[in-house]
Structure formats: C-alpha cells, structure tokens
Regions:
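A detector of single, family-specific signature residues
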Residues: 1-355
C-alpha cells in the first residue's frame, strides 16, 4: 500500500486535464499512472512490528493524557484566581499531590482560614508525602491565612463547588498519566531499540518511547537521515529562485515527533558537553534560542538515525569530536516532569500547539 499526498495527486491531475475537470474514473487513471511512471518517488507504508505499534498507541495516549492534565489544571487555576488567590500563592503546581490534598480539605478561603496544622499534616501523609512535612505545613498554613479580598458567601460557595468538580477531574487525569506511563515504560523496555535510544544524553524512557513511536522500527522507512530530519521538522526548508535564497524552518512535519525533539534539546544541553558547546557556538553566530535548539536536535536526530541503522550506542567522543567530553551530570530527567509541568516551561512552549 502506497500513501500519496492529496496535494500531489491534484498536481498530477493537471498533467492529464489542464481544464481541471475531475471524475472518479479520471482519478483512478491518475493514481494508476502515478505508480506506473514515478514509483521511485513514492514509498509504501512502513511495516512496523506489533510491539512498535503498541508503543505508538501508548505513547500518543500518554501524551494526550499529559495535555489533558495540563488543560484541567489551567482551568482550575482560572477558577481559583477568581475567588482564592491565596491558594495560588501557596502552590505553583496544582497537579502536585500536596496541592490536591490541601484543596480537598480547604476548597474555599473560609475553609482555608479554619484549616489547622494537624489536619493538614495528616492530609499530606495520606497523599504520600514523607519528608519535610513540618516545613511544608508551616508554609501552606501561613499562605492560606493571609488576608484577601473575598467574594460574597453564596458566590464563594458556588465557585468552591466548581473547583471541587475540577479537582475530581484533575485527580483522574493524574492517575491516567501515571498508569499510562507505567504501561508505556514496560512496553518500551521490551523493545530492542530501547537501549540504543536511551543511551543518548537527555532521552528518558518516556521521551525515547515517544520518538520510537513516531519513527517506528521499520528501518527501510527512512533510507537516509535527511528524510528523518525532514519528518521531524528539524531540517530547514530552502527556497531558491534566481538570485534569491531563503532558508526557513519547516512547518509541515510530524508535530508529535517535532514536539518530542524540541523537548529533547534542553536535557541534551545539560548532559552532553559537546551538545552544550555546539549550542553555544550557534548562539554566538546569532541564532535565536529556538533556531539553535532546532539545529542541535537536527544533529541529534541524524546521530540517532545512524545508531539505529548500525545498532550502535551513543558515543560522545564520536558524536562531537574536538569538543569537551567530561561528564556534566549522571542524572537523566523525565521528559514530562522536567519539561512539561513547570510554569516557566509552559511559557517557553507557548508556541507549540496540540496537533
């Protein structure tokens, strides 16, 4: 089976009918001639293994669950801003277990003023907090007892009910993310490409599984690294006509793979001296942060393609020759916990839209 872009089909149709007439019989004739005259320009659909297809479904489901969790948390934040600003001052991450346990006990400013430290301590312990509880309790208790402007009692009660309903949805979303992440990890660890992918600096299990899910394990799908880079959207697009040449970022791409590649840039900088030096060089040449990050991940995608084709693990000395090779850190961050749950990086990723 061969997949052909509908826009390409319309261009082929103009070769046989300049008047732009269209019929089912004519389209069948055009499609047949496409594969007869230009078979080398079109590829058949990839044949991925059953395990790779299952990872594809789990990785996309997990990413959707993460987006749902973020969306619900933002809705809850919007409601709390209207009647409970002291709670927002106490917690940056509303999806954290401490924030959800506290809001369950004190859904309104009135309940927050009445909240006692022993009750809050017990709630945090039930939520799974084991260390630093006294200091956390003191911080939360002090924040909730700060004076604030209040809504009328009936309005405040109604908003508290709204926040409680969103809290239940957020609890479900958090549980869904945790469950899907566990299942995704088990499936990804069984794949033979997992060790090669996670040998790259900054590629955790979740982020590596997302990349594997989008590129698959049919190695004939991308004969060269150039095709994979274009598929991920990290390779630039060059438009040349006469004396004019324009190089721009690629807009048509696999958006999920492009998003994973974007998230890969920051941990790669933290854990690869060669990548950090390469990124710094691009910035010194005048590239913006996003342009330098795309250039870095473009190189990383190319190295990943080579390692998967040759069944080799990542080697820093070969990946970035003539660059510093001393280890910067040994810790690999999680893609979601390190790059998706903080307010600062929500601002950084504000231009990435859900496909």
């Amino acid at each position: 089976m061969v997949a052909i872009n509908p826009l390409a089909v319309s261009r082929y149709r103009d070769r046989y009918s300049p008047s732009r007439t269209k019929s089912d019989a004519g389209d069948a004739f055009v499609l047949a001639n496409i594969l007869r005259t230009d078979p080398h320009s079109h590829r058949s659909l990839p044949v991925d293994s059953e395990l790779a297809q299952s990872i594809h479904g789990l990785a996309r489901a997990h990413q959707d669950a993460v987006w749902d969790r973020l969306q619900i948390a933002n809705k809850l934040r919007s409601v709390l801003r209207e009647y409970y600003p002291t709670f927002l001052a106490a917690f940056d991450d509303l999806a954290s277990r401490e924030a959800r346990a506290t809001l369950r006990l004190a859904p309104s400013p009135m309940h927050g003023q009445q909240l006692r430290k022993p009750s809050l301590t017990a709630a945090l312990r039930r939520a799974g907090r084991t260390r630093g509880i006294p200091a956390t309790v003191n911080t939360i208790h002090a924040a909730l007892h700060v004076e604030q402007l209040r809504q009328p009692p009936l309005v405040e009660s109604a908003m508290a009910e709204h926040a409680t309903a969103l809290l239940h949805a957020l609890d479900t979303a958090v549980a869904n993310v945790a469950g899907l992440e566990q299942t995704l990890t088990l499936a990804f660890d069984q794949h033979p490409d997992a060790q090669i992918i996670t040998s790259f600096p900054g590629l955790s299990t979740v982020l590596g599984a997302r990349i594997l899910a989008e590129i698959g394990d049919d190695r004939s799908r991308f004969a060269t690294a150039r095709g994979l880079k274009a598929f991920a959207g990290t390779a630039p697009v060059t438009r040349a006509s006469g004396m004019k040449t324009i190089v721009t970022r690629r807009a048509v791409r696999n958006k999920r793979l492009g998003h994973a590649a974007y998230l890969w840039a920051l941990p790669m900088l933290a854990h690869s001296p060669g990548a950090h030096a390469h990124f710094t060089t691009r910035r010194e040449r005048g590239d913006s942060y996003n342009a330098a990050a795309r250039n870095l991940t473009n190189r990383g995608i190319g190295m990943l393609h080579h390692c998967l084709q040759t069944r080799q693990h990542y080697d820093e000395s070969r990946a970035f020759p003539n660059r510093p090779t001393h280890p910067m850190t040994s810790h690999k961050p999680s893609a979601d916990n390190a790059h998706q749950d903080t307010n600062a990086q929500r601002e950084t990723h504000r231009d990435i839209k859900r496909p």
